[in-house]
Structures are given as structure tokens and as C-alpha cells.
Amino acid sequence: TAGILFDYGIFTNLSPDHIGPAEHASFEEYMECKSLLFRQCKIGVVNADDEHVDGILKGHTCEVKTFSAEREADLMASDIGFINEDGKLGMHFNVTGCMDCQAKVHIPGRFSVYNSMVTMLVCHLAGISDEAILEGLSKVQVKGRVEMLPVSKDYTLIIDYAHNEVSTRSVLTTLMEYHPKRLICVYGGGGNRSKLRRYDMGEVTGEMADLCVLTCDNPRDEEIRDINNDIKVGLARSNGKYIEIDDRKEAIAYCMKNAKPGDMIVLLGKGHEDYQEIKGVKYHFDEREAVAEILDEMKAGKR
């Protein structure tokens, strides 16, 4: 991107990542590379609440606009609350500063408030009306990222791409803030991948979920049960409760048929993907389609 002058540069947060022999030598070098954006943009829009914001802005040449839920900023959020109604989750909050309004977003989690604020601020700076911003925000969804499917007013069904310990802990922590009656996880593990990741996935889901339904993900060249046996090592560490249903659609159907009011069912690992990779072949499989088919079958009395 050298030589390109951006209209806006955005900073939301920074954590140690992409550090290693083939990437960045240190966190400091990683942050320095990120900070270059604010020397080649006209306006920098930054999260004033992130502990690394000063490092990111070191040497900046742009005009700076800030957003925050904790301190004075160009755009501020307050009175943050959770939406949990008719099987739909989200956040609502008040906005002051360069905008003055009430906002809501149907993506659960506190991080959604920050993502909403930066979106609102950039759109406001670009001259978009407050009404259009709020309408767009109320309708936004991100495919495969805490994506809710409208299945029932009694329970919530969510698709998320989380497929390692860090991302899984993050999404489950977010959902636990909504106080589900039961948190049920449906997932497997990727074949030809680290066993350590499987142990960790089993341990964190066993710790945080009320029930884990082990099933097929992308087994690739491995057997589903071999992969899930590794996951069970982690489940044993956290004394997690589980069942095994190899067919992913059948695993989802089991959870939907046995859901109780207030339950949250989380389909982990596939997210935006629309296939399963088995023995070198990619078979079409979209969880959204599978859920719709199961609903139709349940209505027709076939399940």
C-alpha cells in the first residue's frame, strides 16, 4: 500500500498475533507496521479505549477522530445493554458526541458496540444521515460470525466460525452474558491439523458448555471418530458432558428437536463455509440450508 493515501484509516484493537519466524519478530514491530496506516490516511478513526492506541498513533500525520465507551471522545457510547427477545440477541446503547441517538445492533456481545461505533463514526464523517446509519446498523449481519438463524422464539441457534480455543472461548463468553438456560455446542475438528487444537477445543467447551455434540467438521484424510477421540481428551480434563453423532445434519437436528426454552445452540467451526472436505473431496454442506431442511422436516412430522 506504499504511496496510497487513504481517506480513512481505522484502528479497533490490537493483541499479540502474527508473531513468529515467518511473520513479525516482536509485538513492537507488529504495532509499528500497523501504525504506518496513520501516516498515509487523511483521517484516522481510533478506539480511545484500547491500551495500544498511543503506540498506534505514534508518528501519525492524519487528523484523528476517536470513539469510546469509557472516556471523552468524538463519539461515545453509554447505557449499554443486552437484547434478548424471541430467540434474537443483540446490543443497545446511547450515542453522544458528533451524533446524539439511541442505537441497536442484532449481533451479540460488547465487541459489537465498538464495531458499531467505528462504523457509525466513519459513516457520519462521510456525510451519511443519522437515520440511514441507524437503519443499516439495525439490519446488519456478518455471515458465519455469531450469526443467528431465525428458528424459534423459544431458543436461539447461532453459527460461528470459531475453531480454536481462543476464538471459541471468546464466543462462548459472549453468549454466557445472555444467561442461557443451557449452552449447547455442536462441533468437530479439522483433519490433518494439530492434536493440541483438538485437546484445547474439548477442554474449553467442556468447561463452558452444558452439552457438547461431537460431529463431523472437515475430517480430510482422517477418520471422524479418531479426531473426536482427541477432542474427548480435552473434554475429560474439564469433565465436560458430550454425545457423538457423526453426521453433522443429524447432530444439528438432535439439538433442535431437544431444545428447551431459553437454550442456546452454537454450531462451531464451519461459519461461512458451504462444504465438508472428506477424503480429498469437498461435498456441499451449508449449515443454513441444513437448518432450513430440518425445520421443514419437523413441520411435516418427518422428525
Residue locations for each model-derived region?
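Adenine nucleotide phosphate-binding catalytic loops in nucleotide-utilizing enzymes
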Residues: 21-31, 35, 42-43, 58-169
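Flexible active-site lid/hinge loop adjacent to a nucleotide/diphosphate
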Residues: 1-59, 193
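Short glycine/proline-enriched loop/turn "hinge" motifs that connect secondary-structure elements
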Residues: 1-5, 85, 204
